[in-house]
Amino acid sequence: ELVALDHFNLTIEEGEIFGLLGPNGSGKTTTINCILALLAFDKGTVRVFGQEMRPDSYDLKRQIGVVMQNVAVFQELTVYENIDYFCGLYIRDKALRRQYVEDAIDFVGLNDFRKFYPKKLSGGLLRRLNIACGIAHKPKLIILDEPTVAVDPQSRNKILEGIQELNRNGATIIYTSHYME
């Protein structure tokens, strides 16, 4: 039986950028899934903002933005529609949501691509769309699982600069990578 995490303790302070660095298969994504209460574990607790995270911690989960390694967008929706859809899961007010979507498009630099469908985007632009979908609702905690995998160095640098800006704007960041950057 494979044990991915054993006697694992982790404290991340609000406002911090925390990196989980390790090779593929080392438990980074498993750790994220435990933090998000998507994966059951035998012992212990996970606390986010001082509250215990459980599968039904919906109010707490609204404060979290997640960008997983595998791009998860709808191919039949445009860039704008994808971001609007994911933001709408958290923000019901249409005017506020519209503003948040515009802010996310601006932030990731997809203004010229808002009417494009994902299949027309390069790998780097697709990653930026994935990030926009995860941050559009302006979460306090942003979890990014290998957000720069399989992108060119220029796109990687742009994504890393964006992550630092999100942190400067008050978000706590958990970032996984197998790159030593």
Predicted segments, located by residue:
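Helix N-cap at the start of a conserved alpha-helix in ABC-type nucleotide-binding domains
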Residues: 153-155, 178
